Amino acid sequence: MSKRVFMFPGQGSQYIGMGKEFYEAFPAAKEVFELAGEAAKLDVAKLCFEEEDKIDQTEYTQIAMLTTEAAILKVLQMEGVTADAAAGLSLGEYAAILAAEVMEPSDVFSLIRKRGQYMQNAVPTGGAMAAVLGMDAAVIEKVCEETIGEVFVANYNCPGQIVITGEQSAVDRASESLKEAGAKRVVPLKVSGPFHSPLLQEAGQKLSTALEKVQISTPKIGYLSNVTADYVTDPEKIRSLLPVQVCHSVCWQQTIERLIADGCDEFVEIGPGKTLSGFLRKINREIKCSNIDKLEDLKKYVG
């Protein structure tokens, strides 16, 4: 029997106008934007559709992306499309939390707004990230360990694409060493800080405090953590892992491999862009994959 996964992208795929077609076509999607706006104390619709100067700033990107993903998810659910499991990359994990009904939507929107602010404010000056293409993970890990300064693996995206993070000078040194060691390319990323590194510990601590007040339930469908790349069912374990996720590597490739090993054979990427679909094809070309970003994608998918 077929097993479907909903997967949700993280920062980087955002664009002005994302979610607008759903907002205009479905009252339920509009309600999601309004609920997110109330929880985040922000006009999220205006942010997503008009505010080009803000959409790429972490403190705004996170609530904008999550709201768009949540609105599309809501419409899919109304169309009767269900999933056996949910996973999301970085901030996308909070959309997976919504899909698995782990927390109340208003709590999730409020949390992601805080997470964006905490991460933006915790950013040390001179942090950087870079994507390393065409190199084995073990070599990258070794170079990071041997480089002088603070540099770490941020994301295990898929075979041949790993992201490093840390102090600008250390990331630059590691990038040069990786090129010398045979990396196909090392591409600096346009981000505002060294995300998913121990340098963001302060943001993790603040998020931990914010999570203390939140009611967390047992997931209704399979829910996987970026930190462990495995299913998590215990509410208290979820509470403790989410703050860790901010300053820990995102084990995305391992998460997808875990789901495939569990018999999941259809993946639906919900939200802006096709980043995760691209990763999936590099992990396993045989797996059926769709992505729903625009209204025409939805029509094509639900027939």
Q: What does each of the following model-derived ranges do?
A:
Residues 11-13, 38-40, 100-248:
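Alpha/beta catalytic cores of group-transfer enzymes, especially the acyltransferase/condensing modules
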Residues 77, 179, 260-263:
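Non-catalytic positions within long, well-ordered alpha-helices that form the structural scaffold/packing
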Residues 2-139, 185, 189, 266-296:
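FabD-like malonyl-/acyl-CoA
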Residues 143, 255-258, 301:
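CheY-like receiver
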Residues 297-303:
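Short, charged, surface-exposed secondary-structure boundary motifs
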Residues 247-264:
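A short, acidic, amphipathic alpha-helical segment used as a generic capping/interface helix at domain edges
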